[in-house]
Regions:
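Flexible coil/turn and secondary-structure edge motifs
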Residues: 1-160
Length: 160
């Protein structure tokens, strides 16, 4: 098993997206930290995955296509578009995936590839937000469209 981190807007959404993929064993929701100037805690998830089923580059592509990867984020902000990597191989694969995304969309991808430094878990009541009650208005409005996108564009990796 391997781990990789993602940040991109609300961690409830990010958690729900990765929980919907084959090969993802666990998603830990909370706040991630990198090196300066990205050392402020920001919402995100740590994804534990089986690389025999799903590669880090595919996880990064799913991430890029299910949040505002071309948006502007502040290093000090609570939200940031980022891939938090645990080694050089993940760094290179994430950078290639982001460059390909920018080429495919014709938009600048402002998603940063950052070294993982730290993680603080969310309060228990916020964990598994989508899975505990997918009928919540927030889930229906923001997470359901992302899951529909996964089922349409990553059908072979989408859980039923």
């Amino acid at each position: 098993m391997e781990k990789i981190g993602f940040g991109g807007g609300c961690h409830w959404c990010t958690e729900g997206v990765f929980q919907a993929l084959r090969g993802v064993v666990q998603v830990d929701q909370g706040f991630l930290q990198s090196e300066p100037p990205w050392d402020a805690w920001a919402e995100g998830v740590i994804v534990t995955f089986d690389p025999a089923i799903i590669q880090p580059g595919i996880l990064a592509e799913v991430h890029l296509r299910t949040h505002s990867a071309s948006g502007t984020y502040s290093p000090e902000g609570r939200y940031r578009s980022a891939v938090y990597v645990f080694d050089d191989e993940q760094h290179d694969e994430a950078a290639r995936t982001i460059a390909q995304f920018a080429s495919d969309t014709g938009e600048p991808a402002r998603t940063a590839v950052l070294a993982f430094v730290g993680f603080r878990g969310s309060e228990e009541r916020y964990r598994n937000y989508y899975q505990t009650d997918p009928s919540r208005p927030f889930c229906r409005r923001y997470i359901d469209p992302k899951l529909a996108y996964i089922r349409q564009h990553f059908a072979d990796l989408a859980l039923p």
